[in-house]
Amino acid sequence: MSNVYWPLYEVFVRGKQGLSHRHVGSLHAADERMALENARDAYTRRSEGCSIWVVKASEIVASQPEERGEFFDPAESKVYRHPTFYTIPDGIEHM
């Protein structure tokens, strides 16, 4: 058995009817091309996808749920992002 470890890639597939990619799984591959081909073979067997993204797991940076308060607090001071000062015209029932 080899001691060589291939990097881990996260796989995102966009369905034919979808507008966004969704995470479908992970796989190990020697390079990006192999990751794309393996992702195609493993995650789009029934031709349900129209686009695949593969991203090295080591390159993904994410916020942590336990830091959400301090991370998202700066958005509270940007009142222009909240539609509270718009008036809704008469006759509009659902917005």
UniProtKB/Swiss-Prot annotation:
Stored Gene3D superfamilies: Phenylacetic acid degradation B (3.10.20.520)
Any one GO biological process: phenylacetate catabolic process
Induction (record text): Activated by cAMP receptor protein (CRP), integration host factor (IHF) and by phenylacetyl-coenzyme A (PA-CoA) that prevents PaaX from binding its target sequences. Inhibited by PaaX.
Pathway: Aromatic compound metabolism; phenylacetate degradation
Superkingdom as given in the UniProt entry: Bacteria
GO cellular component terms, A-Z: cytosol; phenylacetyl-CoA 1,2-epoxidase complex
Subunit architecture: Homotrimer. Forms a stable heterodimer with PaaC. Probably forms an oligomer with PaaAC.
UniProt-listed InterPro entries: PaaB (IPR009359), PaaB_sf (IPR038693)
Protein name: 1,2-phenylacetyl-CoA epoxidase, subunit B
Pfam families named in the record: PaaB
Role of this protein: Component of 1,2-phenylacetyl-CoA epoxidase multicomponent enzyme system which catalyzes the reduction of phenylacetyl-CoA (PA-CoA) to form 1,2-epoxyphenylacetyl-CoA. The subunit B may play a regulatory role or be directly involved in electron transport.
